[in-house]
């Protein structure tokens, strides 16, 4: 459920099916992954806080029973920490039954946040981050223009868990293709094991 007139398609994880979708950004700041068509038609932009506040206010008036909010689009953690804290607080203030806020977060965006920033976001009520590992094989990550490395992904995942977040990771099983199936499977398992 959402109240929004912004351009582009809305995407969310399956587990956020009954969440209020709050599009704090439009599109994806990276948006070069060859396997992902989700935000190709949207030019990335961060919405002004006043606009986001208005969406939260309209959403709370229309859906006062909301228990979960999902901050969209492709990588909400690209926002300044103080802006995210404001958004999370406003959600908890206006949705009295709210139990959890979640967001997509790229490994790079998680890694850019300090441990203190991540802890503050979690303490404010951001409970789950959805991140795309895709592959643990650097050759595959380079080929698909993911914009990260296995090392950075491990570091980001460890930082998120240390801050107290639940971490939901996406892995694309066939991304290695026939030529890198073994390396893709092996290195992806290593990354997941190293994170947790």
Region locations from a protein language model:
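Short microdomains enriched in Cys/His and/or Lys/Arg
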Residues: 48-65
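Auxiliary Fe-S-binding modules of radical SAM enzymes
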Residues: 1-17, 95, 190-194
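Conserved SAM/AdoMet-binding glycine-rich loop
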Residues: 60-162
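Active-site mouth loops of central-metabolism enzymes
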Residues: 43-49, 104-111, 176-183
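Conserved, mostly hydrophobic/aromatic
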Residues: 28, 36, 52, 71, ...
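Short, acidic/polar
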Residues: 52-56, 112-120, 183-191
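Conserved C-terminal portion of the radical SAM core fold
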Residues: 128, 151-196
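Canonical Radical SAM [4Fe-4S] cluster-binding loop centered on the CxxxCxxC motif
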Residues: 9-51
């Amino acid at each position: 459920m959402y109240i929004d007139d912004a351009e582009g398609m809305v995407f969310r994880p399956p587990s956020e099916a009954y969440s209020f979708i709050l599009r704090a950004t439009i599109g994806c700041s990276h948006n070069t992954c060859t396997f992902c068509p989700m935000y190709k038609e949207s030019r990335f932009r961060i919405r002004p806080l006043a606009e986001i506040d208005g969406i939260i206010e309209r959403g709370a008036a229309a859906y006062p029973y909301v228990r979960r909010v999902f901050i969209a689009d492709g990588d909400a953690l690209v926002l300044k920490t103080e802006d995210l804290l404001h958004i999370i607080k406003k959600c908890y203030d206006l949705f009295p039954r709210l139990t959890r806020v979640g967001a997509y977060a790229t490994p790079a965006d998680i890694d850019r946040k300090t441990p203190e920033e991540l802890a503050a976001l979690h303490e404010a009520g951001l409970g789950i981050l959805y991140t795309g590992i895709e592959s643990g094989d650097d050759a595959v990550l380079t080929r698909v223009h993911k914009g990260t490395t296995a090392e950075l992904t491990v570091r980001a995942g460890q930082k998120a868990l240390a801050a107290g977040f639940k971490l939901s990771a996406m892995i694309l099983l066939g991304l290695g293709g026939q030529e890198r199936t073994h390396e893709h499977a092996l290195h992806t398992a290593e990354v997941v094991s190293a994170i947790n």
